[in-house]
């Protein structure tokens, strides 16, 4: 439906299984396409990696279980509907820059001054820059964007995930970090 231009956004409501199924489908949609999940598992103690992956999926807690309409679920479901409609309306008027070569840069707190200086120079030379925070997900996003042909170059300035991987640190990548870029 997306490829045919027949939908402008996706909204799903569900419990754990419905969330797993729906968000797996949502992860196949492009970044920027409106994706909203109203879920019983969208709470502070849940791990969202499996549901959100590296995509821009908005998660809304259902508060009550998905077992009919009531004074709690009606306004929550209405908020989910409003969110996806608002996102779709916003996307209709967005002008995405095109034609410039795209360079992704990796950044974290300690490398911010360096990355911002490089970004400023690249922007001045006519490149579009995308800065991704190297919190594991950021590196994965850069790799996926490269696979999808959305970036033409990567400046991997922030490499602390390798240290995390090699020495079991907090932010750790796997051995496949940027494998699609380097190959």
Language-model regions, residue ranges each:
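Hard-cation-handling environments
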Residues: 127, 146, 152-156, 182
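A glycine- and small/hydrophobic-rich beta-loop-beta segment
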Residues: 156-183
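Glycine-rich phosphate/diphosphate-binding loop of Rossmann-like nucleotide-binding domains
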Residues: 98-137, 144-147
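Short, acidic/small-residue loops that bind anionic groups at enzyme active sites
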Residues: 21-51, 61, 130-134, 177-183
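Short Gly/Thr/Asp-enriched flexible loops that form oxyanion-binding sites at enzyme active sites
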Residues: 16-31, 115-119, 168-173, 177
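Cap/lid and interdomain-hinge subdomains that line or gate substrate/regulatory clefts
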Residues: 45-110
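Gly/Ser/Thr-rich loops at beta-strand to alpha-helix junctions
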Residues: 8, 12-21, 42-43, 104-115, ...
């Amino acid at each position: 439906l997306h490829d045919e231009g027949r939908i402008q956004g996706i909204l799903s409501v569900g419990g754990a299984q419905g969330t797993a199924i729906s968000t797996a489908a949502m992860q196949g949609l492009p970044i920027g396409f409106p994706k909203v999940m109203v879920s019983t598992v969208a709470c502070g103690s849940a791990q969202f990696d499996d549901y959100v992956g590296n995509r821009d999926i908005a998660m809304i807690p259902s508060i009550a279980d998905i077992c009919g309409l009531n004074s709690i679920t009606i306004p929550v479901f209405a908020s989910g509907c409003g969110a996806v409609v608002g996102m779709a309306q916003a996307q209709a008027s967005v002008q995405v820059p095109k034609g410039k070569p795209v360079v992704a840069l990796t950044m974290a707190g300690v490398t911010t001054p360096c990355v911002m200086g490089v970004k400023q120079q690249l922007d001045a030379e006519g490149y579009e820059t995308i800065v991704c925070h190297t919190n594991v997900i950021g590196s994965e996003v850069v790799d996926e964007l490269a696979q999808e042909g959305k970036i033409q170059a990567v400046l991997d300035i922030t490499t602390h995930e390798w240290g995390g991987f090699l020495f079991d640190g907090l932010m750790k990548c796997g051995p496949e970090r940027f494998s699609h870029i380097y190959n």
